[in-house]
């Protein structure tokens, strides 16, 4: 859902010059973690379920201990502190439990991906309103036919 949209937005706004990945915290442990290097920016979109967050916190701690990255950004229902972990940016998105009750509570999660895409597009000298130099990507999806069912 949200992580996939953030990854697509970054790739679109950087004209494919920045390649992103998305996964669940558990899924990330099984392979995708191999792409982490000194040029990586990690964005963690954390759950508001405390039982789930235990596993998310463990992965963040493990990555912090074993890797050097450009930055680690955490979006969570409330500001988090993980002892011994240096997080570069913590976005307190909403109150705990709010994601389950309020469909608008996810907006701060999406906004982080939008802002990263926008500023990286500008950093690369692209126009965020029309980042596709080749014209492969447009603001409106084109060429899709709607067929009768």
Spell out what each predicted region is:
Residues 1-149:
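A SIS-like phosphosugar-recognition module
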């Amino acid at each position: 859902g949200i992580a996939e949209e953030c990854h697509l937005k970054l790739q679109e706004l950087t004209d494919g010059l920045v390649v992103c990945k998305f996964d669940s915290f558990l899924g990330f442990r099984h392979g995708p973690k191999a792409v982490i290097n000194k040029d990586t920016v990690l964005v963690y979109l954390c759950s508001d379920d405390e039982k789930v967050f235990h596993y998310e916190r463990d992965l963040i701690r493990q990555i912090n201990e074993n890797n050097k990255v450009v930055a680690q950004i955490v979006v969570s229902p409330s500001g988090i502190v993980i002892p011994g972990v240096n997080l570069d940016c913590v976005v307190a998105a909403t109150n705990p439990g709010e994601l389950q009750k309020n469909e608008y509570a996810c907006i701060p999660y999406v906004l982080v991906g939008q802002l990263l895409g926008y500023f990286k597009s500008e950093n690369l000298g692209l126009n965020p309103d029309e980042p596709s130099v080749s014209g492969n990507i447009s603001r409106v999806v084109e060429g899709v036919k709607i067929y009768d069912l």
